[in-house]
């Protein structure tokens, strides 16, 4: 698959740092590196572009928003490939006029001079729009920071629409031989080393299809979406060392590894151009069918305000049989709290009065005359739809194949979710499936496609 890129040509001059990433430092007077000549390197940084045309479906392409491709700063981290892994680090910024767009090319960014380092085989890393916490961690830990050590940071910092989205190398770099570095600045300026980077977050948007329908006897308004169960930590470089892409919590996780997520963005119509997206860090875990838990995955929450068309009321304040209830049109406005009694005949019975719902359920359980059967206990609080809000969960990427795993989300992917149908009333709480195995989407029908950043579309019936 082709992915459109922005090209940033980097000509960066760096002072050689004297420290290494090891706990014990070499004596500079005895360090043979001091006798090695200076060399130079320039770079082409390939940044994924949000406005490219790339889709696995026949749907229109998605331009994204400008903030997703904003470039504010660039850090280059160079390390000797041999111990003590001597570092060379430099920062370039647009505000400081050391990083600028190439004339006539909005996809290319240029620094104003090459990077100077000592001649040796090197590991070279590029970081775009890095915040202070990330930079400090890398400079303190040296090359070890890139050796698949998890780093904690909130998604609002990784997908920062003011300071730019964080990006790193799209794969762990191979060693750059010393012979590929140049002893003349002019040679370095003419022969760029190329590095591709990816955003470290995934994004999502939800749309209703042209034929979107609400089943369940009522109307649905104010549909919203957002990622839930977001990873708190991530690797700077995606772990592709084995057959499957892995995360730090691949085969073991704790509830505290995740934050809940609070995005509630309005669902778009099929013809809309989205202006807001929900973002989430990568979450690559070992999926086992029937065993893997919802608490270990990152998923999309869909909510909506449901108004039942018909409700059950009582004609007797002390009902004793089915004859004491009647079905009426619901005259309450949208956003009114309602209650549900799901009977054994798989019918969702709606109520506006909670006490009536409880009476109805009690008589069903007791097998009263004219009442449908109800098995088990009824808890009114668990069937209360406050302000009419109901929830559905969409587990994306269920058909993923190697090197991806089912229900995993990966950096630089855009999950475009098309909702075809919803089976109301859904669930009264967004936490309805906590500590349960991941199940196929049953009350929401949606298609989801996934493509590196530009588009991954999925259709769902909820």
Please place each PLM-identified region on the residue numbering:
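Bacterial N-terminal signal peptides that target proteins for export
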Residues: 1-7
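Acidic/polar, low-complexity intrinsically disordered N-terminal segments immediately downstream
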Residues: 22-125, 130-164, 168-180, 199, ...
